[in-house]
Amino acid sequence: MVSRVLVANRGEIARRVFATCRRLGLGTVAVYTEPDAAAPHVAEADARVRLAKTNDYLNAEAIIAAARAAGADAIHPGYGFLSENADFAAAVADAGLTWVGPPVDAVRAMGSKIESKKLMASAGVPVLDELGPDSVTQAQLPVLVKASAGGGGRGMRVVRELSALAGEVAAAQREAQSAFGDPTVFCERYLPTGHHVEVQVLADNHGTVWAVGERECSIQRRHQKIIEEAPSPLVERIPGMRAKLFDAARLAASAIGYAGAGTVEFLADDSPGREGEFFFLEMNTRLQVEHPVTEETTGLDLVELQLAVADGERLDVEPPAAQGHSIEARLYAEDPAHGWQPQAGLVHAFDVPGSRAEFAALGQRTGIRLDSGIVDGSVVSIHYDPMLAKVISYAPTRRLAALVLADALARTRLHGLRTNRELLVNVLRHQAFLDGATDTAFFDTHGLAQLSAPLSDEGVVRLSAIAAALADAAHNRARAAVFGSLPSGWRNLTSGYQVKTFTDDQNNKHRIEYRFTRTGLVLAADEAVQLVSSAPDEVVLADANGVACRFAVARYGDDVYVDSARGPVHLNVVPRFPEPGSSVAKGSLVAPMPGNVIRLGAQVGDSVTTGQPLIWLEAMKMEHTITAPADGVLRSLNVTTGQQVEVGAVLAIVEDPESQAKGDS
């Protein structure tokens, strides 16, 4: 019997496994690297072992040594990292430890997407034909380049022009090597408006194979899921599709002697004349990021069942029937409006008001579950995936589940990093999503710019700026030693106004001019706003109709976050007397995020053209290309391969030939 479990992972999945282990009375062991030293999963474990290097979550020997040192008798791989590495699974078993996962042969069979598709085809599971990167023709475009190992959108590229194929294959190979330790890639036909539908399977070592339920994960960015749900709206509307999917999934699991939790992923088509067709993509021989939606609709604890199967227990003949609807939103530290740029830094505050459960099912009661890898004060590193948390809803109907989740995200208190929160809320409230029209081209169809729009309109931003100014005044008043009883900004000369200026995330400037008189607040602008009350962290304002709204205000240096029922607002304080500083030279290439320079595409003195790739950055295991802003000459190059850079650093300068000629004359 398992008694102490080491989780060979980090973040929210480590916390998720620990939660079940604690409920079952099992000991827990965390491994961590230096960037994760203060992470929540480390603090919550009964024992913790430090790994020497930032990439040691991929070091099988180090993890097994940690298990032995901490007295663990089982290893749970989580997902990502080594979770689908057959050699790691074999090494765990050879070390005399229990592997909380499928048999080694099953992991190996599914570890290569190339070989697994051949195996599934021979077993009678429908598959898309594989294409060799060297044999793709113009007629076969568009194609999808995919890493043979791993997942999560890494090592994946869509290619629409044959001339771009070689470069995209090379980039996918580098990403795959960095993320999974295996650079092998292949190509397959790309369906631009397909549906990503998957089946959760669970099998024991006694011949029972469950198809627990399906999920749809078609809302994706960079081929990585961001909204997942159960059941699938596509499957719900096509008669007979669920039974065929379940049969194919059970067939896939049985063909490789599977045991434990796994997911069989399919690409489904609903174009005219092909409705309900589906093709095997891959089998993930591990727990999925999106497993909570299956737990919510079935009432199962999939981690508990993984542990039970690892202990040799039998499953019931049939799984429980699914009920209701569950949707999961992945909260990422990234900026969708600017190329999905990952963000890194300090999380000042994080709270999802009204969440009723953490890392556990809601008991099929309408509400919100939170599976988070962060808490107040967490630091998001450039070294790992930018997912901060998963916010999950459950409700009797899909529409209610979507609206409950959107409301919870909109009310979430999240200070310190730019995230995809606005995108998630706008998608969940979009009529097309509510109607179930959710294919993989959702962002292209409905416009990423519109879907990334702020949740708060201009009027709310203006009110939030007023609230921020008055909260600052209350803060100053509280600090005043002599005139602490007087309103901040009160003057014997009543004509004087206090001024506070902010910029919002759209670079709009908000100048707030106010003064306090013996009769109350006066604003210089013609704004029908009344002050009900003010404190350093809370201001209540009323509009012309007397409707009051509470604004919670938090300031961290020059960053101000204002949360209200009308929407979240982030502001920056504009100093009254800006410090003199050097401006960035024209043609400068500025790092849009912190990261590591992994490749350079030109040398100083080279002529470059608009859009030409010049510098490749790696951040959070994804490549990001910095291109030339205009035709010109690379005048300076301030970085070298392997160098780590901070956001805002000037990497290089491209100068147009005329400017260079003037400078030389």
Where are these regions (language model features)?
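N-terminal beta-alpha lobe that positions the nucleotide/phosphoryl donor
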Residues: 1-264, 268-291
